């Protein structure tokens, strides 16, 4: 969790960069929270302030098991999704080549439509996060159209996290094509 405008992570700060290369850059450009959450993928969550960071941390910890030998237990009572499951037919297009927003589908499947998205600003073509179905905690992985390298990296990291915590994974496939490089994206007809 990195706090916008406050958290930074880099190997060499602006003075060293300027001395070594002549390039002028700010702390934020080199290693600010927003950059690490959206471009490098180093950080998973971007908080607006310290209180928001604590809220995010509490939400994450509430979804992870406290014992690595036992899986999360299902809760006995749960809330239905906030959006009717009957609306799924309107969310998923009949043309399988047409992408749709996986979050709309998840909102109709997950208990109380309560989804904690993993790295929401990074690899935006892939949606990963924590939720529950009928009280059973699950990890969810889906994609909004073609899978790009950042999305594949994010999915890999999320799969590792779920495996380490013993969390089952639900895969929701919405791949219209696969992008290997940015040059390949220009050549493909999706």
Predicted regions and their residues:
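Conserved structured catalytic cores and adjacent interaction surfaces
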Residues: 168-173, 178
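Mobile "lid/hinge" segments at catalytic clefts and subdomain interfaces of large enzymes
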Residues: 2-54
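Active-site loops and adjacent core secondary-structure elements that bind or stabilize anionic groups
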Residues: 78-130
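Short, glycine-/Ser/Thr-/acidic-enriched flexible segments
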Residues: 7-8, 16, 51-52, 133-138, ...
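Conserved small/polar residues in nucleotide/adenosyl-binding loops
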Residues: 180-185
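Terminal amphipathic helices with adjacent charged low-complexity linkers/tails
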Residues: 51-99
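Long, structured protein-protein interaction/assembly regions in large complexes
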Residues: 117-137, 141-165
């Amino acid at each position: 969790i990195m706090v916008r405008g406050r958290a930074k992570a880099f190997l060499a700060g602006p003075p060293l960069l300027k001395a070594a290369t002549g390039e002028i850059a700010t702390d934020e450009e080199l290693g600010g929270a927003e950059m690490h959450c959206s471009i490098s993928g180093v950080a998973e969550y971007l908080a607006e302030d310290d209180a928001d960071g604590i809220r995010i941390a509490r939400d994450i910890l509430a979804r992870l098991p406290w014992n690595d030998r036992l899986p999360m237990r299902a809760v006995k009572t749960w809330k239905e999704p906030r959006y009717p499951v009957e609306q799924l037919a309107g969310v998923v297009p009949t043309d399988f080549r047409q992408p749709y927003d996986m979050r709309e589908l998840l909102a109709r499947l997950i208990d109380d439509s309560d989804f904690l998205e993993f790295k929401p600003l990074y690899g935006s073509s892939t949606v990963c996060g924590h939720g529950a179905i009928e009280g059973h905690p699950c990890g969810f992985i889906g994609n909004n159209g073609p899978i790009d390298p950042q999305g594949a990296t994010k999915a890999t990291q999320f799969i590792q996290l779920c495996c380490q915590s013993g969390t089952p994974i639900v895969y929701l496939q919405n791949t219209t094509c696969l992008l290997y490089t940015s040059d390949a994206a220009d050549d493909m007809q999706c």
